[in-house]
Regions:
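Central antiparallel beta-sheet cores of small beta-barrel/beta-sandwich binding domains
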Residues: 21-89, 96-98, 152
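Short beta-strand element of the alpha/beta-hydrolase
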Residues: 150-159
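Short amphipathic alpha-helix adjacent to the substrate-entry channel of hydrolases
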Residues: 167-189
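Alpha/beta-hydrolase active-site loop
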Residues: 173, 205-226
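Primarily recognizes the serine-hydrolase "nucleophile elbow" in alpha/beta-hydrolase
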Residues: 218-274
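Short beta-strand/loop motif that positions the catalytic acidic residue
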Residues: 317, 323-325
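Short alpha-helix in the alpha/beta-hydrolase fold that links the catalytic acid
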Residues: 319, 333-344
Length: 398
């Protein structure tokens, strides 16, 4: 649930005007003005796309327009009025950040993400597309298939538009998980959200979790129609976990892996987020006050989220479930959600419900668990959790 309190980034990537070459990748820097330090992360792809993240502002995927790009230089502007221009030298982009005709030096260094998988891969990958005809959406994704794979998972991202790797701040958790699973004989299909990345069509501004669940259902149907796998499961992170139970309640999947998926009504989660993020401001905040907020009332996604109670779908889910949370998760708090899930999930000897000390919402080892740590942590996803996912799925085949 990477929508931080009251912030929704529903902006599409903007194509770059040239080849990224040596500058492709994620670059981080800190803008220092008087006593203020504002980190930025520039994500530049080899295919010619760019997004900008502002971790301390809890905003990501700001689209960047590239006015100039060469193998060692760039100039990126935004519709919200700031421009960055720099030149690559000795592995660092030296440049200036300009806004309102005021320029400040800011250097960008490459972001180190050691878990991101690199080719060649010992398994087959296919670029595929499937369609949610009712929504007019064509979803583009990557199918990773190791030799002899009998089991496949559809991977569903959290809230906000994201690519198939669930990429943020240079981290690519879904790519990391998919690679590890493929190396252990488990296939995956991960896809760009509707109207994002290589996916096209489908309403975005009016879409709710239920609409994104329809996209996921189309992916499950595509996998079943392929006839290549004996078991079709779903892995969902955050909002994707809620979607997993929506499909589980309909009997569409053979098993569920829920990573920090919500198990209580959205208004309770949002209230707890507020209390954790700004305890002094949330002292007198109530669920009733949140429901009266016009920003929530006028936003279809938030309105649905606030009123949706996943326990109805959880209670109707009969398939095996692995549900996990980091105990330092500040966005979908572990105790609140896992205890609720234990109460309502129908008994099944193959369930695994587990919390992990010291892990945040992204399943990184952390200090505070707050979102402003996500970008400064090198680890993308806990290997312990990945190994537990692999071992649990393997038990389902015995």
């Amino acid at each position: 649930m990477k929508r931080i309190v009251y912030i929704s980034v529903l902006l599409a990537l903007v194509a770059l005007n040239g080849a990224a070459q040596n500058i492709s990748g994620s670059w981080s820097g800190v803008l220092e003005v008087e006593d203020t330090r504002l980190p930025f992360v520039y994500n530049i792809t080899a295919e010619g796309r760019c997004t900008i993240d502002s971790p301390s502002e809890k905003v990501r995927n700001i689209p960047g327009d590239v006015d100039y790009l060469s193998p060692d230089s760039l100039c990126i502007s935004t519709s919200i009025g700031f421009v960055y221009a720099g030149r690559l030298q000795d592995g660092v982009i030296h440049g200036t950040f300009t806004q309102n005709k005021v320029s400040v030096p800011m250097d960008l260094s490459p972001v180190h993400r050691p878990q991101t998988p690199q080719p060649p891969f010992p398994y087959h990958t296919e670029l595929v597309k499937f369609t949610n005809a009712n929504a007019g959406a064509t979803l583009a994704g990557t199918l990773s298939v190791p030799e002899g794979a009998k089991c496949v998972l559809l991977m569903v991202t959290g809230s906000g538009l994201e690519n198939r790797d669930e990429e943020l701040f240079g981290h690519k958790p879904f790519a990391v998980i998919a690679d590890c699973l493929a190396r252990q004989g488990i296939a995956t299909l991960r896809y760009d959200d509707r109207a994002y990345g290589e996916s096209v069509g489908g309403d975005v501004m009016g879409a709710t979790t239920s609409d994104f669940a329809d996209d996921a259902a189309a992916g499950i149907e595509w996998l079943r129609r392929s006839g290549r796998f004996q078991q079709v499961g779903i892995l969902g992170h955050s909002e994707g976990g809620a979607i997993a139970f929506m499909l589980g309640a309909q009997g569409l999947v053979d098993f569920i892996v829920s990573l920090a998926g919500p198990a209580v009504q959205g208004d309770s989660i949002l209230l707890e987020q507020c209390r954790i993020a700004t305890p002094e401001l949330a002292e007198n905040l109530t669920i009733e006050v949140l429901h009266r907020d016009p920003r929530i009332q006028q936003n279809p996604w938030y309105s649905f989220f606030m009123n949706y109670n996943p326990q109805t779908d959880i209670a109707a889910t009969a398939c095996p479930v692995m549900a996990v949370n980091g105990e330092s998760d500040c966005q979908v708090p572990a105790e609140m959600n896992l205890s609720a899930l234990r109460r309502v999930l129908p008994a099944n000897g193959r369930h695994l419900i587990k919390s992990y000390p010291g892990l945040n919402h992204l399943f990184q080892h952390c200090e505070t668990g707050l979102p402003d740590e996500y970008d400064v942590i090198e680890e993308t996803f806990s290997e312990e959790v990945i190994n537990d996912i692999i071992n649990w799925i393997k038990t389902l085949n015995h």
